[in-house]
Amino acid sequence: MAPTVMMASSATAVAPFQGLKSTASLPVARRSSRSLGNVSNGGRIRCMQVWPAYGNKKFETLSYLPPLSTDDLLKQVDYLLRNGWIPCLEFSKVGFVYRENSTSPCYYDGRYWTMWKLPMFGCNDATQVYKELQEAIKSYPDAFHRVIGFDNIKQTQCVSFIAYKPPGSD
């Protein structure tokens, strides 16, 4: 028996398009119009509350929490060091974004605080950052102080939180 050889140029027959099939045979969940008529959130309205809009400044990440203890602060700084971020300390007398000199969004639009010394390149211990923070607080006790974690590879600020609020700022 001789082997059969198929030619690559031979065409295969394809059936012509016959149109879409009817969807009447597919299962469909039908709801009665009566089942949606009694839907109400009326029972939940009494327990809803509105967030207070005045006298409730929120500054940065973790600002909704009570002030951080020394241990909590060291844990946060340790977290940013473990991620390879560079700690920076900043301070400001106001503590939140505002526009004083300009209404156009540019470099000096109120988002930048004064940096305390230089970023702490090469820092690998949270207590070093804490000592610098205490020195900054001693020099500027009436200012807000925050810790920033800067990623020098991505060139972005990855974390920022208030580490100290001056007395009477709440």
Swiss-Prot record:
The entry's localization annotation reads: Plastid, Chloroplast
The UniProt entry, under InterPro entries, shows: RuBisCO_ssu, RuBisCO_ssu_dom, RuBisCO_ssu_N, RuBisCO_ssu_sf
Q: Mind telling me which Pfam families this protein's record contains?
A: RbcS, RuBisCO_small
Keyword list (alphabetical) reads: Calvin cycle, Carbon dioxide fixation, Chloroplast, Photorespiration, Photosynthesis, Plastid, Transit peptide
| An individual GO BP term | reductive pentose-phosphate cycle
Q: What is its main location?
A: plastid
Q: Where is the signal peptide?
A: none
UniProt entry tagged with the keyword Lyase: no
What is a GO molecular function of this protein?
ribulose-bisphosphate carboxylase activity
Q: Which SMART domains match?
A: RuBisCO_small
Gene3D superfamilies from the xrefs? Ribulose bisphosphate carboxylase, small subunit
Extract the transit peptide range from the record. Answer: 1-46, 1-47
Which cellular component, as a GO term, is one annotated location? chloroplast
UniProt-listed HAMAP family: RuBisCO_S_bact (MF_00859)
Q: Which family is annotated?
A: Belongs to the RuBisCO small chain family.
Q: How does it assemble?
A: Heterohexadecamer of 8 large and 8 small subunits.
**Reported function:** RuBisCO catalyzes two reactions: the carboxylation of D-ribulose 1,5-bisphosphate, the primary event in carbon dioxide fixation, as well as the oxidative fragmentation of the pentose substrate. Both reactions occur simultaneously and in competition at the same active site. Although the small subunit is not catalytic it is essential for maximal activity.
Other remarks in the entry: The basic functional RuBisCO is composed of a large chain homodimer in a 'head-to-tail' conformation. In form I RuBisCO this homodimer is arranged in a barrel-like tetramer with the small subunits forming a tetrameric 'cap' on each end of the 'barrel'.
The name on file for this protein is Ribulose bisphosphate carboxylase small subunit, chloroplastic
